[in-house]
């Protein structure tokens, strides 16, 4: 037999993120200047607040944060993958057995990971002079975890976050900001959305196939193929109640003040069977005549279930 082993490792990172302003003083001054350029008579951030913020940054990172949200929410991901295979045989039978494992830690700092187990088996045998049989079976089991609002929404929240938005107090309270910004009266905290809930998915797939070939008299060939596919897909969403706090007053604001859980399950089985009789003959050197008849049978059984609870 021949044995093959392989291992692969990789580091992942965001290939590109926007070059945003992370200095809160620069951000507030630039926003004010943009509003004046538009012809507005008043600006968002008054001078006293900007001066207070600039001085406060020297003493209190919670009330006067300078949040770089790309640095806070992204990390280097890590990927590892292992595979093993054994193969061999004789002139009448051959076999191949393989298995693999993959583990991936995503580039977001929480609820961003995946895991996969895979395996396969193939056997081909010349049972008699006329009969040939092949069997194959393969499957995989996958797990992955995503942020509760989904990857695209979470990335959008990170992109929109401002450097004046707070992160988290040592006691676990998620912060917002004491400054008022038009259109951001209930500001998102990207770290809160990454940590306070997730979607966990499990996907299991099995594929099996049996091939039979038999040479009948008079040059007639019989072929049969039986296939089986089973899929199980399970998903669970869970979201905590989300609150943010004014870092100055500790006034609580309801961002998403409910707890919810949702389970979703889907099961499907697919059967296929087809068989053929074929005959062919060559004549005249460059002429071929072929005839084939066959039948096919397919069956699909599926069911799904979903339940949701919200408090």
Protein language model annotation of sequence segments:
Residues 74-76, 86-90:
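Outer-membrane beta-barrel initiation region
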Residues 213, 217, 280-282:
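Short, surface-exposed loop/turn segments at beta-strand-coil junctions that are enriched for proline
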């Amino acid at each position: 037999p021949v044995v093959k082993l392989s291992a692969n490792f990789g580091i992942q990172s965001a290939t590109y993120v926007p070059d945003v302003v992370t200095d809160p003083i620069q951000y507030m001054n630039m926003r004010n200047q943009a509003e004046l350029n538009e012809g507005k008579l008043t600006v968002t951030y008054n001078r006293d607040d900007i001066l207070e913020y600039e001085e406060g940054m020297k003493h209190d990172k919670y009330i006067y944060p300078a949040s770089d949200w790309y640095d806070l929410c992204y990390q280097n991901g890590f990927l590892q993958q292992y595979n093993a295979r054994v193969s061999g045989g004789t002139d009448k039978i051959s076999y191949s057995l393989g298995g693999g494992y993959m583990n991936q830690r995503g580039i977001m700092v929480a609820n961003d990971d995946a895991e996969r187990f895979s395996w396969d088996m193939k056997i081909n045998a010349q049972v008699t002079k006329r009969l040939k049989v092949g069997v194959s079976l393969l499957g995989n089991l996958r797990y992955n975890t995503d942020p509760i609002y989904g990857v695209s929404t979470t990335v959008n929240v990170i992109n929109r976050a401002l450097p004046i938005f707070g992160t988290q107090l040592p006691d676990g309270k998620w912060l917002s900001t004491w400054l008022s910004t038009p259109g951001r009266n209930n500001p998102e905290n990207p770290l809160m959305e990454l940590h306070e809930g997730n979607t966990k998915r499990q996907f299991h797939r099995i594929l099996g196939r049996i091939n039979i070939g038999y040479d009948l008299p008079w040059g007639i060939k019989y072929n049969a193929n039986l296939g089986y596919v089973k899929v199980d897909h399970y998903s669970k969403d869970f979201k905590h109640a989300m609150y943010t706090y004014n870092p100055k007053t500790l006034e609580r604001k309801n961002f998403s003040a409910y707890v919810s859980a949702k389970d979703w399950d889907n099961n499907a089985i697919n059967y296929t069977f087809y068989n053929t009789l074929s005959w062919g003959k060559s004549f005249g050197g460059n002429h071929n005549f072929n005839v084939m008849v066959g039948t096919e049978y397919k069956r699909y059984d599926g069911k799904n279930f979903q339940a949701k609870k919200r408090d």
